[in-house]
């Protein structure tokens, strides 16, 4: 085998730490970016945050040498958009927050109201606070504590009274007596052992508890909850001996109740979203700008930058920190430019949505925007994830505007988002006693030139949180 040397000329892209940092910054949310910026400010003395009243943030001296590896970013690594989160819905809680029982003891035994209201607390914390305000004997207080610990996040008693009584070696009747008092706590319905009891507790706490409609609602919840779930209204009227008007009034009361009262007491802190982009109407045109509140304002510390010219270890450290700071600022600016460019392309393609609503949403995939801004699809994917725009129609994540398409008779296409909007509009306008089935909705859409299978209608209906026809039927 003959050995030899061969010289080849070629180019390749090295994934430098700076390039990795730029890619990572691009896919961070605004909240995460603020944490990243704060960490960089704490670790790099060459970076300062502009506060708005400082005038020393000008360019650093010309004699300072910049890093030689500055080059155009290529953000072409593959990244797949996360699936949309499923839509979840709950009944609205119509009750005001209150307290039950009467206090006993000295002022120093009372709970700290200010600290209780100034922090997020769990359901158990809230119930213990009410127990502290209730007159219990020492044994009753221990039983109340056991019951509260056994209440799950929905507000239901997760363990049987028999098991709880065996745990404390107390009589089940004594434990039941304490449970009934805990069930008077807020939120209404807490401590229930099943759905029927939960709803009954809420009905019994209504001001008009002796009203005929409330009493009828109690009968339904206690003895006929399954029939109500099946929407068997004729049978309910017959069994209860009431007319449709009375049944309708009782059902309105029941539908206003909360089947999961424990979830009204916050167990998690509120997650805030800072919009990256602001979209507004300027006459008949849409204007898209970066949100100044979301843009980090950084500058180079001039005092330390002037010390970067030496060659000893201390000066080399300062020069390395200066190079890192310059690259970080450059990456932030590149991130902002990319977000704005993608946002403007989205708004331009979906301008009919902003003018007319979701029914006018156009089909759009990553390729459409990537071609418009002359970037790789993976770059657009990173930009659309966890980035938000505040618009005249509300707050939207960038990826909301991307959806698949369905063919039309005219040879065009309709956005899946627009079809969901049409579906919601049809179900809202339907006859309540004869709601549209999925097959009927498919036929109505076909009459409008949109060819869609019944199974696809069912998928879009579920995504829009619209129940099936059997559950939408009302009196």
Curated annotation (Swiss-Prot):
Q: Where is this region: Disordered?
A: 42-64, 95-115
Instruction: Cite the InterPro entries for this sequence.
Output: RNA_pol_sigma_54, RNA_pol_sigma_54_core-bd, RNA_pol_sigma_54_DNA-bd, RpoN_core-bd_sf
The positions making up the signal sequence are none
Q: Which residues bind DNA?
A: 365-384
Q: Which residues span the membrane?
A: none
The reply to whether Transcription figures as a keyword in the UniProt entry is yes
**Motif RPON box per UniProt: ranges:** 453-461
Under the cellular component aspect of Gene Ontology, which terms does the record hold?
A: DNA-directed RNA polymerase complex
Task: Please provide the record's keywords in A-Z order.
Answer: DNA-binding, DNA-directed RNA polymerase, Nitrogen fixation, Nucleotidyltransferase, Sigma factor, Transcription, Transcription regulation, Transferase
Annotated GO biological processes are: DNA-templated transcription initiation; nitrogen fixation
- Could you tell me one molecular function GO term of this UniProt entry? nucleotidyltransferase activity
Q: Does the keyword Iron apply?
A: no
Q: Which domain of life is it from?
A: Bacteria
Protein role: Sigma factors are initiation factors that promote the attachment of RNA polymerase to specific initiation sites and are then released. This sigma factor is responsible for the expression of the nitrogen fixation genes. The open complex (sigma-54 and core RNA polymerase) serves as the receptor for receipt of the melting signal from the remotely bound activator protein NifA for the expression of the nitrogen fixation proteins.
Question: Which family is annotated?
Answer: Belongs to the sigma-54 factor family.
This chain belongs to the protein called RNA polymerase sigma-54 factor
Taxonomic classification: Bacteria, Pseudomonadati, Pseudomonadota, Acidithiobacillia, Acidithiobacillales
Query: Gene behind this chain?
Result: rpoN
